[in-house]
Amino acid sequence: MTNIGDLLGNAANDLLQSSINVGDVYLLNLDPSNGITPKNDDATRNKFFIVLGFDNEGNVIGGLVINSKINYNLPSTVTDYQLPITVKQCPFLQHNSFVNCSKIIVAKRTKFCKETYRGEISDSKMMKLIIDTVKESPTINRKQLKNFGLI
C-alpha cells in the first residue's frame, strides 16, 4: 500500500525534475554509460554534476563533473580545461576542487531528485567562465554545444 510520504516524495521529485536549472549542482551516481570511469573495480562513481543544458526534448541533461584534483596523466587538451572552484564558492564541497570543462557528461532527467540536489553555482561570473571555457575546449565539438543549447 502506498503511503502519503511516498506520494509526496514522488510529487516532490517530479516537481524538482521539471525545475532543474543551468548552474544547479547534484551529487549523481555515474557510470561508463555517462562517460565516467569508475575506480578500484567499482561499477559506478559519485560525482558532483553541474547542469549546463538540456536536449531538445528535455529528457537528457548535459553537464560537467567536479574533480578533487587534476589528473596530470591526461593530455593538456584535458588538463588545461580544469577550472578551480573553491569551498567558498560552493559550500557543499568538502575541499577546493576543479570543474572539468573538457567533457560534457550526459545524464537522464530521472537521475535527478531532491536527495541528490546539493546547491547551485550562484556566482553568474563563475558560471559564465565555466560555459566560456567549455565553448573553448578543443575536446568538445559544436554539435555537443548545440545539443545542449550552449551555442
Predicted regions and their residues:
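Compact nucleic-acid interaction/catalytic patches
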Residues: 36-87
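Short, structured beta-strand/loop micro-motifs enriched in basic residues and often containing a Trp
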Residues: 2-11
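C-terminal terminal-subdomain/extension
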Residues: 2, 82-151
